[in-house]
Every structure is written in structure tokens, then in C-alpha cells.
């Protein structure tokens, strides 16, 4: 009996001391160098499955969890055609990229965005990306993770930054293991990676843009850019809809930049992959045959 008590105490101590960031994080790997449309689709599905809260859904669209659900983070490893890898760390509740890791001189090198470095989550990023304290080294990202901050470092708006599998593949090699690279090079890689990973997971429309233009570089159109900036209000509008009708019209943009007025969930449902967490109950399904696939 005494031995059992000791074992229980040891297990509880381990659980208390073990950093929450290490709980059940599975790394999702995407082989960018050998990518196909089907492999990219599978990659997106893996992110959806690991990120979503399995108990939350509005009108058939899965929702991300609140900040209390563990694991709190996702790791996404991107591998180029030369087998070089960069691992992105994403917050599970919103898919924001917090930082990334590569290998430098045989050690795990972690990079943390400036706006994350000033928070209590900094240690989570460091220990999750590079768990071994004796084999890690840090290299700061001296700017924030917002689009305006990234665009400022790149020197042009993201509407003028090409996306595409080959662009993503080549970007990995410009960072991995490199002693010194410019902030412009880093920010351009991150702009591409964030849109092709996080934004594509949030929006089926962006995922489909990548698949449609799979073998060529492309510029994000006005609809892509607008969706990226409207995820929160889109999620709230869908969450608050009454039997498919939005409580107020949602003004968005079409691909050509013209005005797109959304009145019903089914107008935008095909474009959405994941909803941002919104507190409170919502209709899990449409109370008609509008969504036969559910």
C-alpha cells in the first residue's frame, strides 16, 4: 500500500511539473519538395483534425477550441526537396504562428516573434520547438507576427508576394541552417508559409487557390486577402446565424475586388474550413436539406 502511494505521488508530481505545452502534441509533416495536390489536401485535413474541438460545430463547420483545451499548440514541419526542414509552432485556438525552428550547427534553433517574446508563452515556444535545453540556441525575430509588420519587412504588401508550392519549397532553403539571413528573406518566407498553412486551413477557398495554381506561382487575389482579414467576423456571423440567416449582412470582397454581400450561411460555407472559437451555443446543423453532406 505504501509503495502504491509513493507511485501515485510521483506520477502526480510529474504531471504537475511537466510543461502543459508538451502534452500530446503530434507533429504534422508536409513534404513540400514532393508535394501533390492530393498530398496537400491530406495535409490540410490533418491540421483540421488536430486543431478542431471535436465537440464544437456550427452549421457543419468545425470550430477551433477555446484557450483551455489541451494540447494548446500544433507543430507543423515543412520539408523541402533537399530534406531541410522548418517546424512552425501554431496556437491551436487560432492557428497563429508563434515562431519556428530549424537546425543550426547541429543544434535546434528556435525563432520567436517579437510580440510573443514579450508574453508568458515565450517559454512554451522555446521548450516545445526545442525540448532539449543542452542542444538549443535562439535567434530572435525582431518584429511582430502581424501582416503589417511582415509586409513592412518584405517591403511590399502581401498582394504583391507570390504564393505557391515551389516558392514555399525554395524559401525553406534560404533559412534552414543559414548563419545570417536578412529580415526581408525571413519575413517573405513567413508570409508565404502563414498563408499556405494557417490561412488555407481556416479557409477552403484559400486551400483551393493553392490547389488550382499548384504548379505555378500566383498572387493572392482580393477575396483571399479579404478573407484573411475577416476570419473573426465571419466566424461570429456564422455562429450567431438563425437557421442559416445571418443576423445582419456581411460585406466581403469577390476575387476581382467587387463588393460581396453575404446574407446566409450557405453563401459562404463552401469557403470556410475552420471557425474561430466563439463562446456560446450555435446551430450545429442547418434545419433543412441545404447541407446534404452533413
UniProtKB/Swiss-Prot annotation:
Q: What chemistry does it catalyse, as a reaction equation?
A: Endohydrolysis of the N-glycosidic bond at one specific adenosine on the 28S rRNA
Disulfide feature? 58-282, 108-130
Cite the InterPro entries for this sequence: Ribosome-inact_prot_sf, Ribosome_inactivat_1/2, Ribosome_inactivat_prot, Ribosome_inactivat_prot_CS, Ribosome_inactivat_prot_sub1, Ribosome_inactivat_prot_sub2
Signal peptide positions on this chain: 1-24
State whether keyword Signal applies: yes
Provide the alphabetized UniProt keywords. Antiviral defense, Cell wall, Disulfide bond, Hydrolase, Plant defense, Protein synthesis inhibitor, Secreted, Signal, Toxin
Location(s) in or outside the cell: Secreted, Cell wall
Question: EC?
Answer: 3.2.2.22
- State the source organism's domain of life: Eukaryota
Q: Which GO terms describe its biological process?
A: defense response to virus; negative regulation of translation
Entry's Gene Ontology molecular function annotations: rRNA N-glycosylase activity; toxin activity
List GO terms (cellular component aspect): extracellular region
Q: Which residues form the propeptide?
A: 286-294
Record: active site? 199
Q: Member of which family?
A: Belongs to the ribosome-inactivating protein family. Type 1 RIP subfamily.
Task: Give the quaternary structure.
Answer: Monomer.
Known function? Inhibits viral infection of plants, and protein synthesis in vitro. Has also been shown to inhibit the replication of mammalian viruses. The protein may provide a means of cellular suicide upon invasion by a virus.
What name does this protein carry? Antiviral protein alpha
Species of origin: Phytolacca americana (American pokeweed)
Taxonomy of the source species: Eukaryota, Viridiplantae, Streptophyta, Embryophyta, Tracheophyta
